[in-house]
């Protein structure tokens, strides 16, 4: 094991750089288009974590010059009413991007609501048409978190071509689209998940390991190949011994940072990149006007 610790992949700094670039783009385009870009975020219920995420997205929009059209609905709002709102926003010319904040209350059909968003306004990149474009290697709006991971690797000149990338997690939000993006850039990709026996045997093969499970400290230093790149998508709130709460990722940071060459911190790694890519998707839709 090296006595050196891993270099940090600073998602917060890169997100700020991207926001600055987007602000310049918006300022240039606004005169021609005659209005700012618009992002509508739909939140149903009062999930405290979701409320924080929505506020962060609105603040980021303001920095870039994107108009926010927040829609906060009561927990008991019926499916038909949420669908009707989405159709209304699809038709609203001021709105370039639509995002449904997840998770939704259990009585709502998440998949059906995501399908209701017009593909060209799908700011989260989760519509089946956009995921289909990704599978085919075609242009389309990309899923924000995986795209943020790829952009972070690119910023630090970490070429994935020919590397063995191990993705831990198979969700439609992160694991599956990220595996496809890595394939698109010529990585050899393995996907591990909750039913994978001996996870460490798989992760130790990875030149790049991306953890997106949501289990605190799941992957320890002994499960990581020396000099591997560790990308932590997990955001988990745990209680410390003194009773305070703390955010940690899916990697056990202290041990993994002693083995890996690069690692993303939690917070300040992938999280800010997700928001930056959401803004990027909104501006891309805006540019098509």
From Swiss-Prot:
Q: In which pathway does it act?
A: One-carbon metabolism; tetrahydrofolate interconversion
Q: Which GO terms describe its molecular function?
A: methenyltetrahydrofolate cyclohydrolase activity; methylenetetrahydrofolate dehydrogenase (NADP+) activity
**Residues bound to NADP(+):** 169-171, 194, 235
A Gene Ontology biological process noted in the UniProt record is: purine nucleotide biosynthetic process
Would the keyword Phosphoprotein be found if you checked this record's keyword annotation? no
Q: What is catalyzed by this enzyme?
A: (6R)-5,10-methylene-5,6,7,8-tetrahydrofolate + NADP(+) = (6R)-5,10-methenyltetrahydrofolate + NADPH; (6R)-5,10-methenyltetrahydrofolate + H2O = (6R)-10-formyltetrahydrofolate + H(+)
- Key word Hydrolase present: yes
InterPro entries for this protein: Aminoacid_DH-like_N_sf (IPR046346), NAD(P)-bd_dom_sf (IPR036291), THF_DH/CycHdrlase (IPR000672), THF_DH/CycHdrlase_cat_dom (IPR020630), THF_DH/CycHdrlase_CS (IPR020867), THF_DH/CycHdrlase_NAD-bd_dom (IPR020631)
Which key words tag this protein in UniProt? Amino-acid biosynthesis, Histidine biosynthesis, Hydrolase, Methionine biosynthesis, Multifunctional enzyme, NADP, One-carbon metabolism, Oxidoreductase, Purine biosynthesis
Q: Would you say which domain of life the source belongs to?
A: Bacteria
Q: What is its EC number?
A: 1.5.1.5, 3.5.4.9
Q: Name a GO CC annotation attached to this entry.
A: cytosol
Q: How is this protein organized at the quaternary level?
A: Homodimer.
Which NCBIfam families does the record cross-reference, listed alphabetically?
Answer: PRK14186.1 (NF010783)
Tell me its family: Belongs to the tetrahydrofolate dehydrogenase/cyclohydrolase family.
Protein's job? Catalyzes the oxidation of 5,10-methylenetetrahydrofolate to 5,10-methenyltetrahydrofolate and then the hydrolysis of 5,10-methenyltetrahydrofolate to 10-formyltetrahydrofolate.
Q: Could you tell me what this protein is called?
A: Bifunctional protein FolD
Lineage, broadest ranks: Bacteria, Bacillati, Cyanobacteriota, Cyanophyceae, Oscillatoriophycideae
């Amino acid at each position: 094991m090296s006595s050196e610790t891993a270099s940090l992949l600073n998602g917060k700094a890169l997100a700020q750089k991207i926001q600055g670039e987007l602000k310049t783009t918006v300022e240039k385009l606004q005169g021609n288009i005659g209005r700012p870009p618009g992002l509508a975020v739909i939140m149903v219920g009062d999930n405290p974590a979701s409320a924080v995420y929505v506020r962060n997205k609105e603040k980021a929009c303001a920095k870039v010059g994107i108009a926010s059209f927040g829609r906060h609905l009561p927990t008991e709002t019926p499916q038909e009413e949420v669908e009707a709102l989405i159709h209304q926003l699809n038709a609203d010319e001021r709105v370039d991007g639509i995002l449904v904040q997840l998770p939704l209350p259990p009585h709502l059909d998440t998949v059906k609501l995501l399908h209701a968003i017009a593909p060209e306004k799908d700011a989260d990149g989760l519509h089946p048409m956009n995921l289909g474009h990704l599978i085919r290697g075609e242009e389309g709006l990309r899923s924000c978190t995986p795209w943020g991971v790829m952009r972070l690797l690119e910023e630090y000149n970490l070429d994935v071509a020919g590397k063995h990338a191990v993705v831990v997690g198979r969700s439609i939000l992160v694991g599956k689209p990220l595996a496809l993006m890595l394939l698109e850039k010529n990585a050899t990709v393995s996907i591990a998940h909750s039913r994978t026996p001996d996870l460490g045997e798989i992760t130790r093969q990875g030149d790049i390991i991306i953890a997106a499970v949501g289990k605190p400290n799941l992957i320890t230093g002994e499960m990581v190949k020396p000099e591997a790149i560790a990308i932590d998508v997990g955001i988990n709130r745990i209680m410390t011994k003194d009773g305070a709460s703390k955010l940690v990722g899916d990697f056990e940071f202290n041990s993994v940072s002693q083995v890996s060459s690069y690692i993303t911190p939690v917070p300040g790694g992938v999280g800010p990149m997700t928001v930056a890519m959401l803004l990027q998707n909104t501006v891309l839709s805006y540019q098509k006007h």
